[in-house]
Amino acid sequence: MIIAFIRLYQYCLSPFLGPSCRFSPSCSHYACEALARHGATRGLVLSVWRIMRCNPWSRGGYDPVPAEPFR
């Protein structure tokens, strides 16, 4: 269900906003992968942490979803 909302954002809203994410993969793609790989709770925590780091003062760059659950 959460991934459906992210996909809706990706296809309906994101094209009008233009590229603004400082990371690769984009924050919305990261969130979908984190949710699929780690489940709702950990996936949401990882996604929120990523979105908080995506700001003008961040260097950005390549930041993949961690393979192992964080502790």
From Swiss-Prot:
GO terms for cellular component: plasma membrane. The keyword Membrane applies. Keywords: Cell inner membrane, Cell membrane, Membrane. It is found in: Cell inner membrane. Pfam families: YidD (PF01809). Could be involved in insertion of integral membrane proteins into the membrane. This is Putative membrane protein insertion efficiency factor. It comes from Nitrosospira multiformis (strain ATCC 25196 / NCIMB 11849 / C 71).
